[in-house]
Swiss-Prot record:
Entries under SUPFAM superfamilies matching the protein: Aspartate carbamoyltransferase, Regulatory-chain, C-terminal domain (SSF57825), Aspartate carbamoyltransferase, Regulatory-chain, N-terminal domain (SSF54893)
The protein's assembly and partners: Contains catalytic and regulatory chains.
Organism: Yersinia pseudotuberculosis serotype O:1b (strain IP 31758)
Pfam families: PyrI (PF01948), PyrI_C (PF02748)
Family named by the database record: Belongs to the PyrI family.
Function (record text): Involved in allosteric regulation of aspartate carbamoyltransferase.
InterPro entries: Asp_carbamoyltransf_reg_N, Asp_carbamoylTrfase_reg, Asp_carbamoyltrfase_reg_C, Asp_carbatrfase_reg_C_sf, Asp_carbatrfase_reg_N_sf
HAMAP family membership: Asp_carb_tr_reg
Name this polypeptide is given: Aspartate carbamoyltransferase regulatory chain
Transmembrane segments: none
Length: 154
């Protein structure tokens, strides 16, 4: 028995595909990591069916390639995501994500008293992973937060 599968999001010729993003996280990743700061076409799939997790988000950015450092920063919120480099409609490289040691100039400290809110400094967090839990420690106020608290601290 054969089954026909139809792409729900158009293929790209050249660029980056971030796949297997947890559902409801795709838009936040676009915003946090400034993935829309480009003139290139971006295709977003939200709540797509996934055999792995039931539902997923997907981001395709044409003619743009993420560095390994940029891809690893995504791992904090989409640890099972895959980041694929596409060339001539083919996957030419798959990046394996791992948590970075630091994340700079991306996130906002949830502590409203932190100097990073009032001084001209870039935010900076040390990433800590223990027993499957991810936390972030602010360089300035030295408070530690669950990574999801920082995700929603805009």
């Amino acid at each position: 028995m054969t089954q026909d599968y139809k792409l729900q999001v158009e293929a790209i010729k050249c660029g980056t595909v971030i796949d297997h993003i947890p559902a409801q996280i795709g838009f936040k990743l676009l915003s946090l990591f400034k993935l829309t700061a480009t003139d290139q076409r971006i295709t977003i799939g939200l709540n797509l069916p996934s055999k792995r997790s039931g539902r997923k988000d997907l981001i395709k950015i044409e003619n743009t390639f993420l560095t390994e450092q940029q891809a690893n920063q995504l791992a904090m919120y989409a640890p099972d995501a895959t980041v694929n480099r596409i060339d001539n409609y083919e996957v030419v490289k798959k990046l394996t994500l791992s948590l970075p040691e630091r994340i700079d100039a991306v996130l906002t400290c949830p502590n409203s008293n932190c100097i990073s809110h009032n001084e001209p400094v870039d935010s900076s967090f040390t990433v800590k992973a223990q027993r499957g839990e991810i936390s972030l420690k602010c360089k300035y106020c030295e408070k530690e937060f669950d990574h999801l608290a920082v995700l929603h601290a805009d």
